[in-house]
């Protein structure tokens, strides 16, 4: 019935992994923050969406961002793995994470600049691993 569309899809769709950004839902943020503790917004999403075997990728320049830490604790309680991306200092997130990539800077703007190539590299590595 949809032969042509099927051919277009088969020729053009790329492989994908299920991934959800916890900060990409403005309506949810607004509604949740009006009625609940704003620091728990990420944790609430992990609680609703996460399941054992999933991975939470938590980014915090200091490793002490409460909203990220609450999400990480929630993830661990659900049997999820936690990967952290932080600055150089040991932190609550680096201690809680199963794996933590710590870039060798402590100033926020420098940590953020060093995070860019790290997560681009991680994306490339995942693409290679899963889609060759």
Predicted segments with their positions:
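Short, small-residue-biased leader/transition segments that mark boundaries at the very start
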Residues: 1-2
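Beta-rich strand-turn-strand
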Residues: 62-66
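Glycine-rich oxoanion-binding loops at beta->alpha junctions
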Residues: 7-58
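Short, well-ordered beta-strand core segments
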Residues: 56, 82, 100-102
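Short beta->alpha connector loops at strand-helix junctions that form conserved
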Residues: 23, 60, 86, 101-109
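Short, glycine/polar-rich helix-capping loops at beta-to-alpha or helix-loop-helix junctions
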Residues: 85-97
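A charged, well-structured terminal subsegment
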Residues: 48, 56, 109-132
């Amino acid at each position: 019935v949809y032969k042509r569309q099927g051919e277009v899809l088969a020729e053009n769709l790329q492989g994908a992994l299920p991934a959800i950004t916890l900060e990409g839902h403005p309506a949810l943020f607004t509604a949740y923050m009006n009625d609940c503790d704003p620091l728990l917004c990420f944790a609430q999403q992990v609680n609703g969406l996460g399941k054992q075997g999933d991975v939470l990728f938590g980014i915090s320049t200091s490793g002490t961002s409460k909203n990220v830490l609450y999400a990480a604790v929630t993830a661990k309680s659900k049997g999820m793995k936690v990967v952290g991306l932080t600055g150089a200092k040991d932190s609550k997130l680096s201690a809680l994470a199963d794996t933590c990539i710590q870039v060798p800077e402590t100033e926020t703007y420098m940590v953020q600049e060093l995070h860019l190539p790290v997560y681009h590299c991680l994306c490339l590595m995942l693409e290679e691993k899963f889609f060759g």
